[in-house]
């Protein structure tokens, strides 16, 4: 029920406010799924051997997935009517 959720106003937020934790297990599956969902077919996001050949320890998350997780965090904290304008 959406009425249970409140959107924070600027007056309710201050620089230095402590934000709640958001625990997300970052797995290879999440990294690969995020890359495929955003149509990012660069092999370093889904092929461990290619990532290692590039000097990386494993596949790594693409920027769009990172941004999506940050937007999720911000809007979960700030409320359903909040809009993320920039990160």
Predicted segments with their positions:
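Catalytic strand-loop segment that frames the active site of acyl-thioester-processing enzymes
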Residues: 2-59
């Amino acid at each position: 029920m959406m009425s249970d959720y409140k959107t924070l106003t600027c007056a309710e937020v201050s620089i230095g406010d402590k934000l709640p934790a958001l625990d997300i297990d970052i797995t290879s599956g999440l990294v690969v799924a995020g890359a495929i969902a955003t149509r990012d077919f660069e092999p370093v996001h889904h092929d461990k051997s290619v990532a290692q050949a590039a000097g990386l320890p494993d596949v790594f998350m693409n920027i769009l997935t990172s941004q999506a997780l940050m937007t999720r965090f911000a809007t979960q904290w700030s409320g359903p009517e909040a809009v993320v304008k920039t990160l």
